[in-house]
Amino acid sequence: MIKKITKVTLCIILVVSAFSLLMAWRLDVFVKIDEKKPSTCEAIELYGSAEDIEIDYSNGTAYLSILDRKGLIQGKDVQGSIGRIDLNNMPWEIESVFSGEGLDNFRPHGLSIYGNTLAAINHPKERGKDPESIETFAISSKGIEHDKTLISPLLESPNDLVLVAEDKLYIGNDNMFNSNINSFEKIQQQLGRPYSTIVFYDGADMSIAAKNLASVSGLNVTEEGYIIASETNAKRMRVLKQLDDGKLEKLGAISLDGSPDNISISGDKIVVAQVASVSSLIQHFISLQKGDYKPSPSKIESLVFESDKSNYVRKREIMFLSLGEDISTASVGVQWDDKLLIGSITDDKIYVCQLGE
């Protein structure tokens, strides 16, 4: 009897230990941040934080998803905007090109550009209750003009999106609001079990393109047409192939040390922002709720994508890694010539660094 009890106790200890180690890995408890940054960086102040930045490389224009997310965390009723930078004219200045005109509410998140179309995820005031939407815009020399609003029950918790044509796009759902799973499954989801989806819009209707993903927080498309999706809870980027009917076939994955967020792609280079320490990010959000400020580390990594390699990566490089005292909670990194632009979840600025020094 005593031996049986001892075995049961040991099994319980092993299970608890394994669970604790898994949570420690998920939360980056043992991560040590050794800063690596360009020597020359400067901040451009904003009237909110730029969670996502998209560059139109054909004409050198950057679009920013701007919202007072710090105020949002503190329970304030805030409205956002889309900002624009002419990257060809120095010094860079940010102008607002859309502030929700014609919409009852505008709280932008992920952005995407294709040709003369810009698309933005728009969150409602009552997330989880009111419908999420995708707003599309026509781009012209004068600015951007709102075109249409796309709504579907499949948009449960949209985080990012990517246009693959002017009237076709993929939308990634993260794990914040998912009505299709129970409370126990939500706990498993936080541990990395994949319950998230990618939705396809074909110009008329929406459908599920891919299932069982670990919280999609970033989406983009390579020159060859592969969809790259951030699986934040699994610390990896998923490589997917577009099929003729819009569905996505899972091909493989790119492992990362951090939890990936937004992805930018230019040529064969992928630039991905990562949460370097989830535990620090949680502490950052808690401090904001209390009216304090505790920075969270920021990480930007570049990878040279090669579709015929087994791990899809020819080269990796840390472009920016800091404790967050210069820019905290980095959510996006985009490269323009020899400059790196970094946006943040909560910091009211973008950070611009000179590369190659």
Model region roles, listed by residue range:
Residues D257-F320:
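Loop/turn-rich, solvent-exposed surfaces of beta-rich toroidal or solenoidal domains
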Residues S99-V164, G172, M176-F177, S183-E185:
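Asp-box/WD-like beta-propeller blade repeats and closely related beta-sheet repeat scaffolds
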Residues Y47-D56, G100-N116, S152-K168, G192-T197, ...:
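Beta-rich, blade/repeat-based domains predominating
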Residues Q79-N88, P131-S141, Q188-G203, D292-D308:
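Beta-propeller blade signature
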Residues A50, R69-G71, G75-G115, A119-P124, ...:
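Blade-loop segments of beta-propeller domains
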Residues L64-V78, I121-K129, I171-R193, A273-P297:
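Short, conserved, GDST-rich strand-edge loop motifs in beta-rich repeat architectures
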Residues E42-G80, I327-V332, T346:
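Beta-strand-rich domains and repeat architectures in extracellular enzymes and scaffolds
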Residues L27-S49, E93-S96, I144, Y312-L323:
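A short helix->beta-strand "capping" segment at the edge of beta-propeller domains
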